[in-house]
Swiss-Prot record:
Residues 18-40 are annotated as: Required for apical membrane localization. It comes from the Eukaryota. Targets the cAMP-dependent protein kinase (PKA) to the plasma membrane, and permits functional coupling to the L-type calcium channel. The membrane-associated form reduces epithelial sodium channel (ENaC) activity, whereas the free cytoplasmic form may negatively regulate ENaC channel feedback inhibition by intracellular sodium. GO terms for molecular function: protein kinase A binding. Binds cAMP-dependent protein kinase (PKA). Interacts with PRKCA; only the cytoplasmic form is capable of interacting with PRKCA. This is A-kinase anchor protein 7 isoforms alpha and beta. GO terms for cellular component: apical plasma membrane; lateral plasma membrane; plasma membrane. Keywords: Cell membrane, Lipoprotein, Membrane, Myristate, Palmitate. Residues 2-11 are annotated as: Required for membrane localization. Signal peptide: none annotated. Residues 72-104 are annotated as: Disordered. InterPro entries: AKAP7_isoform_gamma (IPR052641), AKAP7_RI-RII-bd_dom (IPR019511).
Length: 104
């Protein structure tokens, strides 16, 4: 069975590296580039096919960039100092309980 890869970035590696430095600024820049529906309207008030394809590609690109941003934020939060503090307090609690048990 084939596997689906969620990182088809051959040409967009620069965009990923931009996310590492200022992810929210990059996403804001892309969201400003999305035009309103009036730019490619047909007579019936609907956007033409080329406009829909272009907007669909942009939406997918934005979704992927947001997913990468979320991943980077989550991995950076895991590596921050202070994560081990919960382990230290658990160890201190266990030591405190052991001392109380020894006194009884």
């Amino acid at each position: 069975m084939g596997q689906l890869c969620c990182f088809p970035f051959s040409r967009d590696e620069g965009k990923i590296s931009e996310l590492e430095s200022s992810s929210s600024a990059v996403l804001q820049r892309y969201s400003k580039d999305i035009p309103s529906w009036s730019s490619g309207e047909k007579n019936g008030g609907e956007p033409d096919d080329a406009e829909l394809v272009r907007l669909s590609k942009r939406l997918v690109e934005n979704a992927v960039l947001k997913a990468v941003q979320q991943y980077l934020e989550e991995t950076q939060n895991k590596n921050k100092p202070g994560e081990g503090s919960s382990v230290k307090t658990e160890a201190a609690d266990q030591n405190g309980n052991d001392n109380e048990n020894n006194r009884k």
